[in-house]
């Protein structure tokens, strides 16, 4: 596949992150889409270069993506239990 495809998918996920800010779940899905496109781009670019220093980079990126997904799930469950919804409007800094 062409690396331009993954760059375009990253930009689409970034625009989704900018425009769909009502629910926390939609924000986390856009972040996961961005992480997936970066992972695919890193995997393709490391296969093109064939350097030993770039081979573990997609695996490291995948590890960070899994950690991000776990943390986002914990945040979503915690917010749903405390606020009874996942709306971003219910989050303010003054409630802390």
Curated annotation (Swiss-Prot):
Topology class, membrane: Multi-pass membrane protein
GO CC annotations on file: mitochondrial membrane; respiratory chain complex I
EC top class named in words: translocase
Family: Belongs to the complex I subunit 4L family.
The keyword Transport is annotated on this UniProt entry: yes
Subcellular location: Mitochondrion membrane
Catalytic activity: a ubiquinone + NADH + 5 H(+)(in) = a ubiquinol + NAD(+) + 4 H(+)(out)
Keywords: Electron transport, Membrane, Mitochondrion, NAD, Respiratory chain, Translocase, Transmembrane, Transmembrane helix, Transport, Ubiquinone
Entry protein name: NADH-ubiquinone oxidoreductase chain 4L
Functional description taken from the UniProt entry: Core subunit of the mitochondrial membrane respiratory chain NADH dehydrogenase (Complex I) which catalyzes electron transfer from NADH through the respiratory chain, using ubiquinone as an electron acceptor. Part of the enzyme membrane arm which is embedded in the lipid bilayer and involved in proton translocation.
Entry's Gene Ontology molecular function annotations: NADH dehydrogenase (ubiquinone) activity
Lineage of the organism: Eukaryota, Metazoa, Chordata, Craniata, Vertebrata
Cross-referenced Pfam families: Oxidored_q2 (PF00420)
């Amino acid at each position: 596949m062409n690396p331009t495809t993954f760059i375009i998918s990253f930009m689409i996920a970034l625009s989704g992150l900018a425009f769909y800010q009502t629910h926390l779940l939609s924000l986390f899905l856009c972040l996961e889409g961005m992480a997936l496109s970066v992972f695919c781009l890193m995997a393709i670019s490391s296969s093109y270069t064939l350097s030993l220093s770039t081979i573990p980079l997609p695996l490291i990126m995948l590890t960070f993506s899994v950690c991000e997904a776990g943390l986002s799930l914990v945040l979503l469950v915690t917010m749903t239990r405390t606020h009874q919804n996942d709306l971003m409007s219910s989050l303010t800094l003054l409630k802390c």
